[in-house]
From Swiss-Prot:
Job of this protein: The glycine cleavage system catalyzes the degradation of glycine. The H protein shuttles the methylamine group of glycine from the P protein to the T protein.
Pfam families tied to this protein: GCV_H
Cofactor binding description: Binds 1 lipoyl cofactor covalently.
PANTHER family the record matches: GLYCINE CLEAVAGE SYSTEM H PROTEIN, GLYCINE CLEAVAGE SYSTEM H PROTEIN-RELATED
Species of origin: Psychromonas ingrahamii (strain DSM 17664 / CCUG 51855 / 37)
Transmembrane found in the keyword field: no
Family membership noted in the UniProt record: Belongs to the GcvH family.
SUPFAM superfamilies per UniProt: Single hybrid motif
CC cofactor: (R)-lipoate
Name of the protein described by the UniProt record: Glycine cleavage system H protein
Lipoyl-binding domain location: 21-103
Domain of life (superkingdom): Bacteria
């Protein structure tokens, strides 16, 4: 996990792409809790997200879990690989298993996210 990653308390990770957009996925801890991911309900490119609102759903052999948008903005790209290979979330949650890219409406919302260190400390067993 890179130190540039930021996190939410609902286990989404966020990477600032440096161009006004962010990449979002779920944390390694989240994928471990879910177990084998079998389906991702992908949003549509062009959909708007509202920070704190659900934007997607991940289904595993154990449970279905809503994903919450960490930022307000517009979905500009989805990871189409997940439609045929949802297991990428388990195999590579921080790279090949990314879920969406969002164009930020307000960069200041990134200040509300946790650092990698804070996330790990908050979720230490």
């Amino acid at each position: 996990m890179g130190s540039a990653l930021m996190f939410t308390d609902t286990h989404e990770w966020i990477l600032d792409n440096g161009d006004g957009s962010v990449t979002i996925g779920i944390s390694n801890q989240a994928q471990q809790l879910l177990g084998d991911v079998v389906f991702v309900d992908m949003p549509e490119v062009g959909d708007n997200t509202q920070a704190g609102e659900t934007f997607s759903l991940v289904e595993s052999v154990k449970a279905a879990s809503d994903l919450y948008a960490p930022v307000t903005g517009e979905i500009i790209e989805i990871n189409e690989e997940l439609e045929d290979s949802p297991e990428l979330i388990n195999e590579s949650p921080y790279s090949a298993g990314w879920i969406v890219k969002i164009k930020l409406a307000d960069r200041n919302e990134l200040n509300n996210l946790m650092s990698s260190e804070d996330y790990l400390a908050a979720n230490a067993e």
